[in-house]
């Protein structure tokens, strides 16, 4: 599986892409006006992960994502990279319940 497709799946974007009329070639309005807040956050996270950086600074990257999506993305994306430093800032204590075990 290509790396981009893997990141799209891990960030929970595959279903969103499949629903768009032209898939990954669909036009996104400037500033993402035709996307939900959760979609914008998941796209931003996917773009960051695709960069394959050694350090990530993520400011509340899952606040607009639904609760089940938060945990899945946190487990598959944020905690899976053992070689990078990930600095997270959250403003919602609900994140801590599944974060404490990582």
Please name every model-derived segment.
Residues 56-60:
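Catalytic Walker B motif of ABC-type/P-loop ATPase nucleotide-binding domains
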Residues 14-43, 61, 65:
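ABC-fold ATPase nucleotide-binding domain signature/coupling loops
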Residues 6, 40, 76-77:
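Short coil/turn segments at secondary-structure boundaries
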Residues 45, 73:
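Hydrophobic anchor residue at the start of the ABC signature
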Residues 76-100:
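Conserved catalytic loops of ABC-family nucleotide-binding domains
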Residues 1-27, 52-54, 69:
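Conserved "ABC signature" C-loop
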